[in-house]
Amino acid sequence: MNIRQSGKYYEYKTLEILEKNGFKALRIPVSGTGKQALPDLIATKNNTIYPIEVKSTSKDVVTVRNFQIEKLFKFCEIFNFCECHPLVTVYYKKYKIVIVYELSQDVRTKEKIKFKYGINS
C-alpha cells in the first residue's frame, strides 16, 4: 500500500499543519483499535484540547460513522475540567484542500455523518 493511500499519511500531514499554526499535537497510533475513546490526533492551543478524527477522500463526500464521532465526545468528557472541542479534518484529494469541521452535540444522535465538499465547509 502506498503511504499516501493510508490514513497514517494524512494524520502526519495534519500534525504538520497544526504545528505550523502554533498547536501542540500528537498522533495516537492505536486510535482505531479497541473500545477506548481515543482520537487519531490530540492537539492543544490556548488552554483548549482538540480531539481530531482524520479522514481523506478522492470523492466530494466522506462518511464518518457514529462510533468515531462518539469517541471524540467521550474523550472530551474525560477532560471536562477544560475547554474541549471535537474536530474532524477531511482531505479532499481531488481539490488538494483540507477542511476542518468542528462538531456540535447534535451530531451525536446520528448514525453517520456525511461531510460534503462545498456544503458543510
From Swiss-Prot:
Cofactor needs: Mg(2+)
Annotated residues for binding of Mg(2+) 2: E11, D40
Keyword list, A-Z: DNA damage, DNA recombination, DNA repair, DNA-binding, Endonuclease, Hydrolase, Magnesium, Metal-binding, Nuclease
InterPro entries, per database record: Hjc (IPR002732), Hjc_arc (IPR014428), Restrct_endonuc-II-like (IPR011335), tRNA_endonuc-like_dom_sf (IPR011856)
GO biological process: DNA recombination; DNA repair
Binding site for Mg(2+) 1: D40, E53
Enzyme Commission number(s) from the entry: 3.1.21.10
Catalytic residues as annotated in Swiss-Prot or TrEMBL: S31
Catalytic activity of the protein: Endonucleolytic cleavage at a junction such as a reciprocal single-stranded crossover between two homologous DNA duplexes (Holliday junction)
Entries under Gene3D superfamilies matching the protein: 3.40.1350.10
Domain of life: Viruses
One Gene Ontology term of the molecular function aspect: metal ion binding
Site, Transition state stabilizer: residue positions: K55
Keyword DNA damage: yes
Role played: A structure-specific endonuclease that binds and cleaves the four-way Holliday junctions in DNA created during repair and rearrangement by the ubiquitous process of homologous recombination. Introduces paired nicks in opposing strands; on immobile junction cleaves 2 bases 3' of the junction point, on mobile strands the cleavage site varies. Cleaves Y and loop-out structures with much lower efficiency. Binds 4-way junction DNA but not sequence-identical linear dsDNA.
Family, as annotated: Belongs to the Holliday junction resolvase Hjc family. Hje subfamily.
Subunit structure: Homodimer.
Name listed for the protein in its UniProt record: Crossover junction endodeoxyribonuclease
Organism: Sulfolobus islandicus rod-shaped virus 1
